[in-house]
Each structure stands twice: as C-alpha cells, then as structure tokens.
Design a protein with these regions (language model features):
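Generic detector of well-ordered alpha-helical segments enriched in charged/polar residues
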Residues: 27-32, 152
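Conformationally flexible catalytic loops at phosphate/diphosphate-handling active centers
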Residues: 1-8
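Surface loops and adjacent helix of pleckstrin homology
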Residues: 21-23, 125
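Feature 9007 captures long, charged alpha-helical oligomerization segments
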Residues: 33-37
C-alpha cells in the first residue's frame, strides 16, 4: 500500500517510520505515547519557573548561550539568570561586508536590554578553525584550529577589532556587560586587548559618548 492509498497515517517522529492504516492496537499505543510526551512537556514547563537548586539546596545560576538575536525571540528573560555567552561570529558572516560599529552596537544593545539588568557576556570574534570568514581569516593556514584565530586574529587586524571594542563599550551603558576574549594563550595577548580597549574608551570619551568599562574575562 502507498501513502496515497491510505486513509490514516501515523508518523513516528522518533524512528522516522510511517504506519499506513494501522490497527487499533497500534493507534492506541501511539495515543498513549502522545499523552506521555505531553505530560513530560507540562512537567518540564512547570519547572522552568522554579529556581535551579540542587538536592542539598545549593542554588545554581542558569545562563543561556546564544548565537544571535533569533535565539531570544521566544525566550522569557525571567526564566534565566542572564546570557552566559554571545557568539559574535554571526555578525561577520551575514553579508559581503564586515559589520560596522553601529550595526554591532545595535545588536549588542538589544541583547543587553533583553536581559533586563541581568549579566551578559559577549565574546569577541572567534573566527578561524571551523569558522572561516571570507576576507578575514587566513586561507590555507597549516593549523587553522590553533593558529591565527580568536584573539590572535583580532590583534592581527586591529582596525577590525577596534570597531568591535567600540561597539561593546557603547553598549555597556545599557546593562552589566562582560567581555570574553577567546583563545588567549599568553598574558601579553590580554595586555594588548586591554590597551586597545583603553584607547577605544578614551576615543569615545573625546567624541562625547557615555561609556562604562565592562569587565574583561577569559
């Protein structure tokens, strides 16, 4: 029998199997499974609004990791304790041109405002390895996963890194922001980032922006 000839079809989403005109016992089994799945979903939904606490009453902070604004569309900020990681690579791969300062600032601002005062950690660009970006990462690098990527790529392209740092500093006035720097291997790399961020901060002050220095974390 083909699916066109069947008057009733059950599709098992777990196994990918389809049952054409199944017997009554099969229908009842799938109805039972459907009820069980709905009950599990209801129990999980009820737990979302409760604080995360271990069996010995230890509170645990639950923060979400996101890779773009779309991840926040259907998420209530009150159900988590903030954003634990924002991967900014999506901004650099959406079009033919690299994102300018205002574009980045607007995205970071929306994320921070969504959190409603809860902490937000944004990671600077971690391009390279399995995340190449045309015109930015190095083609044909012998060791792309551990070579010029993360902070090393940012420091090698300070004109691009400076734009991201300025956007982050401007967005920091909208809520508690932390900046994560990826792939740091030696203290000198972090010192260089601090220097560039300090320069960007002072440039913004001279231009008249109100900024707050975000915490810098690894």
């Amino acid at each position: 029998m083909s699916s066109k000839d069947a008057s009733f079809v059950i599709v098992d989403g777990a196994s990918g199997e389809a049952y054409l005109d199944p017997k009554q016992v099969t229908r009842e089994e799938f109805q039972r499974r459907q009820r069980d799945d709905q009950e599990k979903s209801n129990r999980a939904a009820a737990l979302l609004e409760k604080p995360a606490v271990t069996a010995d009453s230890t509170s645990i902070s639950m923060l979400v990791n996101i890779a773009g604004l779309d991840d926040l569309k259907n998420l209530d900020p009150s159900l988590c304790d903030g954003i634990g990681l924002v991967r900014t690579e999506f901004l650099f791969g959406e079009g033919p041109d690299l994102p300018n300062e205002d574009t980045q600032y607007d995205v970071y601002r929306q994320m921070i405002e969504w959190a409603q005062g809860r902490p937000v950690t944004i990671r600077t660009l971690d391009a390279g390895g399995d995340k190449p970006i045309k015109g930015l990462t190095i083609d044909g690098e012998s060791n792309p996963f551990l070579g010029v990527r993360g902070v090393r790529l940012s420091l090698a392209r300070p004109e691009i890194f400076r734009v991201q740092l300025r956007a982050l500093l401007r967005a920091a006035v909208h809520g508690p922001l932390k900046v994560m720097v990826p792939m740091v291997t030696v203290p000198a790399e972090l010192d260089a980032v601090r220097m560039l961020m300090g320069n960007a901060y002072h440039d913004l002050k001279r231009e008249g922006f109100t900024v707050a220095v975000p915490a810098l974390g690894m």
